[in-house]
């Protein structure tokens, strides 16, 4: 159910509020371009600066606009287990198909603490759960052995792996087999992860080039490895450009340059430096995304 190019969609703002019209248009554009799933309220969606009502509103809009055409995987993670349960239950009530739960950040739990955190959430909620491992942001790395334990739970169905460590991903897939779906959380490793047995990606770059990203995964699934490889190299400069400053600053700036959203962030995130903005524009022009 959860495979291919799933966009870690941005949250557009306008004068400090969620730009609902721009958001709805973005979702429709993604579906038209072939995106396989929408992931609201993740890192790229600036979930950390949304209040509860805004968080729920973003999920609600996504579910309503998608209207069951493709899966909606709502970001519901927290470093408080009780809070994660609360948000996940709300996402379930709003109609999300699954929940994406980042590892608890700042409080740095042990592997046993991580296991108990996710098991508690799975025991007390009713939708499929996808773990999210991004130690570069959370300072905690959920190890393959811990994921293998969690994969025994019927509601824990996947993991977004954003370590960029293919040795760890390989061990993870070897230990878990088909019990869990492994998704790339690092666009640089999308093709490599597929070769190891992964099934898709929760992608930042898909925000600006949904058609090409979806086509990469479609080509792989059809066995057209050479075409998938060509798309990988075509997308590589864009993947790099999306991280010349902290995500989601570059991707939102790119979407603003493309006329899709306003160039607006919430503090402590702010606009790009002019130097990096010029570099970004050059990459977008080379890719044919802006004139």
Curated annotation (Swiss-Prot):
SUPFAM superfamilies to which the protein is assigned, alphabetical: Aldolase
Keyword tags: Amino-acid biosynthesis, Cytoplasm, Diaminopimelate biosynthesis, Lyase, Lysine biosynthesis, Schiff base
Active site residues of this protein: 132, 160
Keyword Ion transport: no
Alphabetized NCBIfam families for the sequence: dapA (TIGR00674)
Family of the protein in this entry: Belongs to the DapA family.
Protein name: 4-hydroxy-tetrahydrodipicolinate synthase
Gene this protein is translated from: dapA
């Amino acid at each position: 159910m959860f495979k291919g190019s799933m966009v870690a969609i941005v949250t557009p703002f306008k004068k400090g509020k969620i730009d609902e019209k721009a958001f709805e248009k973005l979702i429709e554009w993604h579906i038209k371009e072939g995106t396989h799933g929408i992931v609201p309220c993740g890192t790229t969606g600036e979930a950390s600066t949304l209040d509860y009502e805004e968080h729920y509103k973003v999920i609600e809009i996504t579910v309503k606009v998608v209207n069951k055409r493709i899966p909606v995987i709502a970001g519901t993670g927290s470093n408080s287990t009780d809070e994660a349960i609360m948000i996940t239950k709300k996402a379930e009530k709003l109609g999300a198909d699954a929940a994406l739960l980042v590892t608890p950040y700042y409080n740095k739990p042990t592997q046993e603490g991580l296991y108990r955190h996710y098991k508690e959430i799975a025991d007390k909620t009713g939708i499929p759960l996808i773990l999210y491992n991004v130690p570069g942001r959370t300072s905690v790395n959920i190890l393959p052995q811990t994921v293998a334990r969690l994969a025994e739970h019927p509601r824990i169905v996947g993991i977004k792996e954003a370590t960029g460590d293919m040795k760890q991903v390989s061990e993870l897939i070897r230990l878990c087999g088909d019990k869990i779906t492994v998704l790339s959380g690092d666009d640089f490793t999308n093709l490599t992860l597929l070769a190891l047995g992964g099934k898709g990606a929760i992608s930042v770059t898909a925000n600006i080039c949904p058609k090409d990203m979806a086509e990469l995964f479609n080509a792989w699934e059809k066995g057209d490895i050479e075409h998938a490889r060509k798309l990988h190299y075509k997308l590589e400069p864009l993947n790099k450009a999306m991280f010349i400053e902290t995500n989601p600053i570059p991707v939102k700036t790119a979407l603003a340059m493309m006329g899709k959203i306003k160039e607006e962030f919430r503090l402590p995130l702010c606009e790009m430096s002019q130097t990096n903005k010029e570099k970004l524009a050059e990459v977008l022009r080379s890719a044919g995304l802006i004139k």
